[in-house]
Regions:
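Canonical Rossmann dinucleotide-binding motif of NAD(H)/NADP(H)-dependent dehydrogenases/reductases
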Residues: 2-41
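Rossmann-fold scaffold of SDR-type NAD(P)-dependent oxidoreductases
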Residues: 61-62, 82-91
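Generic recognition of short, well-ordered alpha-helical segments
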Residues: 21-22, 48, 72
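Short, solvent-exposed amphipathic alpha-helical segments in soluble enzyme
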Residues: 24-28, 51-52, 76
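Short, charged/polar "capping" segments at the starts of alpha-helices
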Residues: 41-47
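Conserved Rossmann-like nucleotide-binding pocket used by diverse enzymes
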Residues: 9, 35, 58-60, 87
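Conserved Rossmann-fold cofactor-binding substructure of NAD(P)-dependent oxidoreductases
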Residues: 65-80
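Rossmann-fold cofactor-recognition segment
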Residues: 50-68
């Protein structure tokens, strides 16, 4: 398990055909804790998509173009899962 105890944020988990979904699946299979983000209508889609991967994935609201949302998401992620070891922005 090469990613054991690593925490990775993945954006863009919307469908099981996305690069983000495939990356999250591989990361989980290799021991990582995955957190995800979404915004607007995509937030609900992301919440549904991650359930197909794991019930343990936390989803945070974040639009990368909204600095206030980014700052809030960073704070919430740090509070709930600690420091991240990696980020994949796959939108």
């Amino acid at each position: 398990m090469i990613l054991k105890d690593k925490k990775i944020l993945i954006t863009g988990i919307l469908t099981d055909k996305s690069i983000a979904f495939a990356t999250a699946k591989i990361a989980i299979e290799n021991g990582a804790t995955v957190v995800a983000t979404g915004f607007g209508k995509g937030l609900r889609i992301t919440e549904r998509a991650v359930k197909r991967l794991s019930e343990d994935i936390k989803v945070f609201e974040m639009d990368i173009e909204n600095l206030n949302q980014v700052n809030e998401a960073v704070k919430n992620i740090e509070d709930e899962v600690g420091n991240l070891d990696g980020i994949l922005h796959a939108i």
